[in-house]
């Protein structure tokens, strides 16, 4: 194999990594973002290049031989941030662990070390890769040397060969120093010739080749001022070229044999990653070494032929293993228990037929600790078995401690808490279509290890939750809610399939009519769903203005089409066609596919541990996303009907809950007063920002005020509001300014919560749910701004989510206490959907709003609107 040398500009890559990534730190408070980014780059290079030789070059100090020639060389550079300086020793440790030599040389820069070693390697016939963020190094490009310059971040790079240097600059690599000689380089404080920029410099070098030739040919150059500058600053041009030239014969005391890559010291790498908290790299290392076959310490357990009393303790960790994505119809393949007496595996056909075990499962006084108890509860319900007494759910506990860490299985949570004696589900079963259940001994050991992990992790996670004041959030909100959601999922929602099919036929007719009209306006038939064909019709044939292009042609995205709508009638029809098509494929056909063949219902699955705000989402199907803006979309709700004759659908939703939460959290007197007086908050806001009386508020003013109100909740900028309302940024800024003048407490809250997030690293909801914001201190403006908006919004949106969850629990209790048949079916953001016998509706009209409005006590009243009817559509 041909020798390949990789040369890395250590300082440059470290700087790039530091500024590309948010400030990260380990549990000791040591900053690690530059080391993290450097590691990403290093792993990528080693995997892709597979070098035989490698070297990382560093700058030795601030003074080099260039300073002796020009004292102000690199003058004016900003001080290295202390958060970066403290990471250079860690970088050295990283390179030692990887067994990659690092080298620096007094009075020389890293560039000179790289230039020298590249020249030596070239002479020996090596292929050479240079990695840096400094474009000066493109002067090294040659048939054997490729220079890779980091662009955004550290893993996005541009490769420079002699051909690409010519393509990019119009000059050869050798002429890069001449370019710097004429135009200078602000980043290195190389002066160049005043008045000469890149364009002029390139033009001169294309004509004359070198700085020396340019200076020898001044009389042939056009432009008196240019000639004058070249004559006056002749010495500066030659000096600048000298400063820009990379030294290729520095006294580097390394041979090529000294930088042979021998592979990492795995033990040291793992130890360093653990110290730095680089869990994702540790996970990747585990996967690459086939973690599924990694030997674990032995664990005693019994594969039982029958259920015994010692298994059925007063408290035990329980695993009811359901293998498959959709637990409504996936099989239960095994059951495991761990308690103070031991660890046990039970075959499902044995356990689920044993009266003692079934009684234990349903006994509220027998405490169970589990992972994703809802999944097990639903799977058991399909077998007519009830699960009660769950006192700890590892999935929900881990979710509350850090909602950004998606806990896919027990092993993922265990790893986060330094518990290693369990394998991942993927390692045991495989994934996707290749997922299979292993032989019984392997399965039994896996499930027992999971049960043992759950048993071991309850105490440390509960301790952490107590320290965060989140223990009640788990035990009084999320865990009780899991049982309620299990009931809702199993109950399902009845679907009128005939009505859905009828809607599908109607949509097909509408689509065909819209399609015909589009063809008429286009003057030809074409594939409307093909962006390429659509682009050709709109921009080539109809000559509409081109607003945006993609790699493959014209952009026909929704935002582009909306801007084009005023230009031609066809655009409006295309947008309508797309909307109808999505309704047909996603909602009509999609819903029909998931209707249960026996129950005639759709049984969704609620994601309780997914969003970082605490809101629920649902899948298979996503019933929280049934469209409401388009009338055809709203009509889909006509297909959702009660499951019993003479029953009705009852819907209740919180009115403006997020704005009410904002009033409470911000303690803004004007906002509080408006809600207490029962004013229309959007009308009130319109009065304030437009300075008009209530009678003079127009529908358009109220619409704009509504956009301001909800925009403020999401920390909207003047640019975002301008886009939403189709007004100028200046007008949007004035709206926001007037809003804050009317509600100063809101402005104070926004400022305070961002500062609090920067100090603590997280924000909390009213019920102590946390969201961590590592990007809140990012040096990248866009990244930091997004984190700041998230800090403003999460306490509001998250508190609203907490409130409706509390209402669901309270409502379930009241329905049971009052022995009503009414049952919860769905939660859709701020709305609860129930079904109930007609004779209970009058009581629900009193009970449901009462319970929802009293779920929590705020400084402003909560308000609930309710409706009922024969379908979900009618309950509006």
UniProtKB/Swiss-Prot annotation:
Region feature (Polymerase): 469-876
- Catalytic activity, EC: 2.7.7.7
Region Subtilisin large fragment, annotated ranges? 289-876
* Reactions that this protein is recorded to catalyse: DNA(n) + a 2'-deoxyribonucleoside 5'-triphosphate = DNA(n+1) + diphosphate
- InterPro entries recorded: 3'-5'_exonuclease_dom, 5-3_exonucl_a-hlix_arch_N, 5-3_exonuclease, 5-3_exonuclease_C_sf, DNA-dir_DNA_pol_A_CS, DNA-dir_DNA_pol_A_palm_dom, DNA/RNA_pol_sf, DNA_polI_exonuclease
Per UniProt, the keywords (alphabetical) are: DNA damage, DNA repair, DNA replication, DNA-binding, DNA-directed DNA polymerase, Exonuclease, Hydrolase, Nuclease, Nucleotidyltransferase, Transferase
For this protein, the record's Pfam families field holds: 5_3_exonuc, 5_3_exonuc_N, DNA_pol_A, DNA_polI_exo1
- Record keywords: DNA-binding included? yes
Record has DNA repair as a keyword: yes
Entry GO MF terms: 3'-5' exonuclease activity; 5'-3' exonuclease activity; DNA binding; DNA-directed DNA polymerase activity
Listed under GO biological process in this entry are: DNA-templated DNA replication; double-strand break repair
Q: How does activity depend on temperature?
A: Optimum temperature is 65 degrees Celsius.
Domain 5'-3' exonuclease positions:
1-310
The UniProt entry, under NCBIfam families, shows: pola, PRK05755.1
Other noteworthy facts: The enzyme from this organism does not have any 3'-5' exonuclease activity. The subtilisin large fragment (residues 289-876) has wild-type polymerase activity but no 5'-3' exonuclease activity.
What function does this protein fulfil?
A: In addition to polymerase activity, the recombinant enzyme has strand displacement and 5'-3' exonuclease activity, but lacks proofreading 3'-5' exonuclease activity.
Q: How does it assemble?
A: Single-chain monomer with multiple functions.
Similarity remark: Belongs to the DNA polymerase type-A family.
Protein name (database record):
DNA polymerase I
Upper taxonomic lineage: Bacteria, Bacillati, Bacillota, Bacilli, Bacillales
